[in-house]
A protein has these predicted regions:
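Alpha-helical transmembrane segments and their helix-start/interface "positive-inside/aromatic belt" motifs
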Residues: 2-34, 100-116, 174-189, 242-243
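Membrane-proximal helix-loop-helix units in multi-pass membrane proteins
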Residues: 116-182
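Internal transmembrane alpha-helix with an interfacial aromatic "cap," most often the third helix
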Residues: 72-135, 167-168
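Membrane-helix interface motif
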Residues: 37-57, 90, 123-138, 198-211
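Generic alpha-helical transmembrane segments
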Residues: 73-85, 150-169, 230-233
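Membrane-interface segments at the starts/ends of alpha-helical transmembrane spans
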Residues: 54-72, 137-153, 212-228
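N-terminal topogenic module of multi-pass integral membrane proteins
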Residues: 1-92
Length: 263
């Protein structure tokens, strides 16, 4: 049994040594995919916003807007559960013995996850959120499911949540720093803060049912959006943790990492 285990570990170590430390293709493809997708969404809004998005009782509204809502919600829920399940199913069950080079490679993979997560947060919590405020300051709503809400609340928010949970689960199941040494407060805040913006949508829409107010972040009803949004600054804490671990791995393992030995 020990011979088999030793042979398997030797083969794994050889495969790790051949794998590049950083593969930028997933990061590039993820960035391009998100940006192209949202540019397409923005063009769709431009074409069908005024044409079919002003009267929720019109059949065009159901055709061009409610159909999107009916499709995106189950797709996002399934994606969330499938990603969490896959990350857990394929987790590394021996994090205490991850090779230094492999751990470094996984750190770079996590950085790619975080960068794509940041891009998704920009589109959802910044671009489409500001757009939503502009829409509702110029158009009188007759439904909570306005065109801008269908894109902002029920598309862009769940999308960055799915990407965020992917990165969080990757860290918890692949990296010893996050998976076998307790919980990282910084990473928990980085994921939970933006995530909590989504359930806060319910409070926001309930409030708008009773009060008419300008779509400004200084309005009390919108304070929690800002509060949870600022949690994204925890990315600096996560960055410091990752950089600290990179320094630890590099010290004394230069030959494994493909680095020049320190003089």
């Amino acid at each position: 049994m020990s011979l088999v285990s030793g042979t398997a570990r030797t083969g794994e170590a050889a495969a790790v040594a051949e794998a590049p430390l950083f593969n930028g293709i997933p990061l590039i493809l993820g960035t391009i995919a998100i940006n192209v997708f949202y540019v397409g969404v923005r063009i769709y809004e431009q074409v069908f916003g005024q044409f079919a998005g002003l009267d929720s009782f019109a059949p065009e509204f159901t055709t061009y807007w409610m159909t999107i809502l009916y499709i995106e919600e189950p797709v996002e829920l399934i994606s969330f559960l499938a990603l969490v399940g896959w990350m857990w199913k394929t987790r590394d069950t021996d994090l205490a013995n991850v090779q230094p080079r492999e751990e470094m490679r996984r750190i770079f993979n996590l950085i790619s996850w975080i960068m794509v997560y940041g891009i998704a947060i920009y589109w959802g919590a910044s671009y489409f959120t500001e757009q939503d405020g502009t829409w509702h300051m110029t158009v009188i709503r007759d439904t909570d499911f306005t065109p801008s809400h269908i894109i902002e609340f029920y598309m862009s928010y769940p999308m960055y949540i799915v990407i965020g949970v992917g990165g969080f689960m990757y860290a918890r199941t692949r990296l010893p720093t996050y998976g076998s040494k307790g919980w990282s407060i910084a990473y928990v805040l980085l994921f939970v803060g933006p995530f909590m913006i989504f359930p806060n949508v319910g409070l926001n829409e309930w409030g708008h049912t009773f009060w008419f107010m300008e779509e400004l972040f200084v309005e009390p009803l919108h304070w929690m959006f800002v509060f949870f949004g600022w949690f994204s600054l925890a990315v600096f804490g996560v960055t410091l943790q990752l950089l600290g671990r990179v320094v630890e791995l590099a010290h004394g393992h230069e030959e494994l990492l493909g680095l020049e030995p320190a003089e």
